[in-house]
From Swiss-Prot:
Protein name, UniProt field: 4-hydroxy-tetrahydrodipicolinate synthase
SUPFAM superfamilies membership: Aldolase
Pfam family, one: DHDPS
Claim: Cytoplasm is one of the keywords in the record: yes
Subunit structure of this chain's protein: Homotetramer; dimer of dimers.
Coiled coil: none
InterPro entries xrefs: Aldolase_TIM (IPR013785), DapA (IPR005263), DapA-like (IPR002220), Schiff_base-form_aldolases_AS (IPR020625)
Lineage of producing organism: Bacteria, Pseudomonadati, Pseudomonadota, Gammaproteobacteria, Moraxellales
GO cellular component assignments: cytosol
Active site (catalytic residues): Y143 (proton donor/acceptor), K171 (schiff-base intermediate with substrate)
Any one of the GO BP annotations: diaminopimelate biosynthetic process
Disulfide bonds: none
Subcellular location(s) of the protein: Cytoplasm
UniProt site (Part of a proton relay during catalysis): T54, Y117
Amino acid sequence: MSTAYDDIKTRLQGSMVALITPMLRDGTVDYKRLADLIDWQIEQGTHCLVAVGTTGESATLSMQEHSDVIRYFVQHVKGRVPVIAGTGANNTMEAIKLTQDAADAGADCALLVAPYYNKPPQEGLYQHYKAIAEAVNIPQMLYNVPGRTVVDIAQETVERLADLGNIVAIKDATGSVARGEQLIKVVGDRLVVLSGDDGSALELMKVGGKGNISVTANVVPKAMSETFTAALRGDFDAANQVHDVVKHLHRDLFIESSPIPAKYALHKMGMIDKGIRLPLVWLAEQHHATIDTALVRANLL
């Protein structure tokens, strides 16, 4: 593959936020708040932005909205940091269309979640990703999150996919450091291995991971950036010192299905309106105190 593919591999590192998609109370995308969040994340040191991933409510945006939000990200970021576009689907043809739209918009990389609900076998997973890789000329990242998709991309399948030149990375959201470490051993020479689990991401960095695609960074981007910048240079004492102040958020921001708690937190911080799409609903009142206390502990309120 071209040097552009090698270049993006060197830039897929550090603290990478899976940004929420801000919405008005009627559920429409709030582009003004989205611009503000993008600028804030970059100012706070976030290394990469993920548009319309799981945390961005990809499952409930229409295909047109999905592509529109990705295009807006790219246009507003203007090359300041890489934009990773969530373009996965459980319909291969839809995933190809979304990925092509992201490539046309100028996204730096496509994030492709494993097909959910229809539970393909490993050969189906391989053929799904192979079809997208062959159809669209853009760096692509595998996304394994079996807790949501109910399908697990096996290591052997990842090894096969690593031979396809435009698959450049994997986001491993299994939460298993041992598994991530094994991936680094077998495909680390070909793929960038990233954590997709805030709670174990720093531990994965200690064994060769390159960064973290984070929910928590929605709320504390500077702390997460400082943590993973220190980790990248091998200074884990400094990383832990910053991380210890905010690591409770990794638990509390999942007190309900993500991104419900993160959206509540950002609303409480005055950064977004009270908008979310069904079937997700606003944070239950009995959990407000948990998030409020977590924000106070992180010096955010």
